[in-house]
A protein has these predicted regions:
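A compositional/biophysical signature of low hydrophobicity enriched in polar/charged and small residues
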Residues: 1-319
Length: 319
């Protein structure tokens, strides 16, 4: 079965369909019930995604609010593909960058945990990157008021590159119980303090990975989204990038299919504009986020034990 089949697009949508469910833990039983199949079928399809090299794993990203930053997406247009490729390692050294998406043209889409008033064009020039920078409406990630503990940051640090590490291994390394690690992780997920993002190899999609952006007239969004999803059929990803903007990700068989869908979308009532990009690959970046998370526990003040705790310890010593 090809990854272009609706069975796989439906599965991927349930696993990681949009940023608002990145922090939602779903069991195979729940996914199976939603898709109308049995649990073993879901398990086998996920295994196939891994076996063909498409699903490489998952990474953890802390909510940018906890770092005093905001989620931002930059589109950088270059004069040619050569200058684009040369810019990727330089952009990977920029503070806040967590991944770099390359399209089959002369553009890059850079995901950044950015300072609130960041001057991106100036920052890019400072890196020696010659490209035209524009800010793409971000895919909304909810903020959080969760208060991270030192242990929380230590747990996150160990999951940044591999969100599927065994909890007992983490517990052993941090010298706490597995139950404690599980409890803290569940709490962080529930409060939106961390997000689990899929890591995929787009070259193994057995098709073309499209991203369709649509700007919609006021009050027509739900209607347009419904018709676009019905037209595409195998939507993997759907999200809002602004009040009247929507993004759809899907895998097509060829370039002609993508062109036909784009032309159809532009002609629909309520659609103001539409654009389509073909994703080539995604470069995962860890340097900045690892250093940022690693320093967090070191800068946290050591809390004095409460009077009650001191009394308990004193009594314990006397006994």
């Amino acid at each position: 079965m090809s990854l272009r089949d609706k069975a796989y697009s439906d599965l991927m949508r349930e696993l990681w369909g949009s940023p608002d469910i990145w922090n939602t833990k779903k069991s195979y039983i729940e996914i199976a019930a939603k898709l109308g199949v049995d649990e073993e079928t879901v398990r086998n399809r996920v295994k196939h995604l891994r076996d063909v090299g498409f699903l490489l794993g998952y990474r953890v990203v802390p909510n940018p609010t906890l770092l005093g930053r905001v989620f931002a997406s930059l589109r950088i247009e270059f004069r040619d593909r050569e200058s684009k490729q040369a810019a990727i390692p330089r952009l990977a050294q920029m503070d806040g960058v967590i991944n770099i998406g390359s399209a089959y043209d002369t553009s890059l889409l850079v995901t950044v945990l950015a300072d609130q008033d960041q001057d991106f064009p100036k920052l890019i020039v400072g890196l020696g990157v010659d490209g035209e920078v524009s800010l793409v409406p971000g895919l909304g990630l909810r903020t959080t008021s969760f208060r991270m503990t030192k242990l929380d940051w230590e747990i996150v640090r160990l999951l940044l590159r591999d969100a599927e590490r065994k909890l007992n291994e983490i517990a052993k390394q941090l010298k706490v119980s597995t139950r404690t690690v599980k409890r803290r992780l569940n709490m962080m997920m529930k409060e939106g303090a961390i997000f689990t993002m899929p890591v995929v190899d787009l070259r193994k999609t057995e098709g073309i990975s499209y991203q369709l952006r649509v700007q919609i007239e006021q009050g027509k969004k739900l209607e347009v989204e419904k018709s676009v999803v019905a037209k595409i059929g195998n939507v993997v990803f759907r999200a809002s990038d602004s009040e009247n903007g929507s993004v759809f990700g899907f895998t097509g068989a060829n370039v002609a299919e993508g062109s036909d869908i784009l032309e159809w979308v532009k002609q629909q009532p309520g659609v103001k504009s539409g654009s389509m990009t073909i994703a080539e690959r995604v470069v995962q970046v860890f340097d900045w986020i690892e250093s940022e998370v690693e320093r967090r526990p070191k800068t946290m003040p050591v809390r004095e034990p409460s009077p009650e705790r001191k009394m308990q310890e004193t009594i314990g010593i006397r006994r």
